[in-house]
């Protein structure tokens, strides 16, 4: 490449690359700065409200709180959010996926018994008796914000906390369903939640300073 062409290429890269960084990515995104965003969420158990720019899911009784979005056609997905266990929490918080009812779903949770736990509830019957399947040790703290990420593809799920791989699990009993958040005897604060995947509608997400996820990452990481 001669010098003139090299300079031209460098100028093009300098002009285009910043535009790529600042253009919107596409995902279903909630920053919870607008109280109207609460109307998208279906609360199956517990209480869900938007307070000070965060979605608060609360059920401190000895039972679960679940809030979901989506429909029964959703399959594979990437879910990200910032999540905090608030004061008064006694047990766990996390994600649910492929949910058809409040007794039919998969769940991954960050637990106050110092572990990350995966399980599933199939028509009211808990897998593994409700105990976490192959739990991973984790030093869970109240009032500490964590960045959670769940990647679901086919029968496979993989979970990250603050970018650290916390394990992989497989199960073939549930193929589709809604996604959401869940607590058990806890209060969970959620911010900057985004989700994408095949068939999931999109809203513009600014890729600067946001958790913009791309469906292509699933294929790229394989």
Predicted feature descriptions by range:
Residues 160-182:
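Short, solvent-exposed beta-strand-to-loop segments that form ligand-recognition rims
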Residues 10-22:
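Bacterial N-terminal signal peptides
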Residues 59-126:
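Secretory/extracellular carbohydrate-interaction modules
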Residues 32, 191-195:
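Extracellular beta-strand elements of beta-rich domains used
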Residues 34-66:
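Extracellular glycan-recognition surfaces and repeat-rich motifs
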Residues 124-149:
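Short, aromatic/His-centered strand-loop micro-motif at the edge of beta-sheets
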Residues 32, 79-81, 141-161:
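Short tryptophan-centered beta-strand motifs in secreted/extracellular beta-sheet-rich domains
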Residues 24-45, 204-220:
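Extracellular carbohydrate-recognition regions
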């Amino acid at each position: 490449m001669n010098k003139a062409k090299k300079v031209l290429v460098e100028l093009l890269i300098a002009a285009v690359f910043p535009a790529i960084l600042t253009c919107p990515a596409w995902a279903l995104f909630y920053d919870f700065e607008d109280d109207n965003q609460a109307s998208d969420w279906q609360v199956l158990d517990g209480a869900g409200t938007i307070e000070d720019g965060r979605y608060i899911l609360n059920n401190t009784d000895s039972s679960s709180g679940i809030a979901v979005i989506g429909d029964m056609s959703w399959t594979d997905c990437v879910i990200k959010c910032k999540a905090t266990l608030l004061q008064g929490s006694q047990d766990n918080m996390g994600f649910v996926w492929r949910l058809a009812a409040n007794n039919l779903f998969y769940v991954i949770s960050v637990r106050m018994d110092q572990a990350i736990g995966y399980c599933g509830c199939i028509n009211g019957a808990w897998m593994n008796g409700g105990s976490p399947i192959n739990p991973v040790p984790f030093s869970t703290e109240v009032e500490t914000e964590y960045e959670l990420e769940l990647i679901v593809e086919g029968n496979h799920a993989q979970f990250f906390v603050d970018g650290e791989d916390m394990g992989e699990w497989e199960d073939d009993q549930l193929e589709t369903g809604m996604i959401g958040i869940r607590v058990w005897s806890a209060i969970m604060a959620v911010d900057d939640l985004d989700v994408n995947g095949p068939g999931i509608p999109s809203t513009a997400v600014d890729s600067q300073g946001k958790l913009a996820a791309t469906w292509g990452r699933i294929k790229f990481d394989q």
